[in-house]
Amino acid sequence: EAIKKSKRLKSKIISIGITNQRETTILWDKNTGKPVYNAIVWQDRRTSKICENLKKRKLENLFRHKTGLFIDPYFSATKVKWILDNVSISKKLLKNKQLMFGTIDTFLIWRLTNKKHHFTDATNASRTMMYNINSNKWDDEILKKLNISKSILPKVKNSADDFGTTSKKIIGEAIPINAVLGDQQAAAVGQACFDKGSVKSTYGTGAFAIINTGNKKILSKNKLLTTICYRLKNKNTYALEGSIFIAGAGVQWLRDKIKLIDNAQETEKISKSIIDND
């Protein structure tokens, strides 16, 4: 659609970059390319009980120090586990080595390259709660705790890397895919947050603040997430992130469910009419 709207020749497109919802999870059949279940989006809280069980097993410190994340339904790991536990076809495909996992970037790469490449980048991997941000590998100990097979996981690459070439069968032209970043990290790069201490805040469905911490991984004492901002030439640049799940989604709720407003723009006038909201 973007190519058609731009009215540009496909042959003049030098390369493609992908940015995506980070934690949203898909498992699919390697042979057919069809998902075994609907994508479970980042806001979905259905895996709360799985997370509580992990906490009861006193695994919070393990996950925190290895992945930089807290045990929470937000991240991909327990979504993967839920599908494996509740969708019968996934077990059969896993047994036959036909099951694949990916966040949205991985699924897009798989489809755009016509099933040739099963890749992700470090920023997306760092949001799965299965990736060790110290060793830069899928973590065997964590996978064992979750009973998730490494065989379904994609290869993790630099954020700027060779992710394959689009298939002519898919979009009519062979175009290199040379960059992949999770959406919030892509926003940080877009705002030129390349220096240690530089910060961006994005307001959309949720609100997300990211601060570049350079080559140093910092574990926050204030419930911030430790994540990978980007990886270039096999070197991580780390970040701290504050995530608020409901921002613009709250405005949507006021408009569509409560019917308090007719359009989102009205919220600005209402906010400005209040002298003090303490």
Positions of predicted regions on the chain:
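N-terminal glycine/serine-rich phosphate-binding loop of ATP-dependent small-molecule kinases
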Residues: 1-37, 49, 61, 65, ...
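Short, conserved phosphate-binding/catalytic loop or strand-edge motifs used
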Residues: 23, 77-78, 125-126, 160
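Glycine-rich phosphate-binding loop of ATP-grasp-fold ATP-dependent ligases
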Residues: 36-37, 70, 123-130
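Carbohydrate-associated surface elements
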Residues: 44
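Active-site core segments that coordinate phosphate-bearing ligands/cofactors
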Residues: 48, 55-69, 73-118, 129-140, ...
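A structural motif corresponding to the C-terminal end of an alpha-helix
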Residues: 145-152
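Gly/charged, well-structured mid-domain segments that form the phosphate/adenylate-handling core
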Residues: 155-162
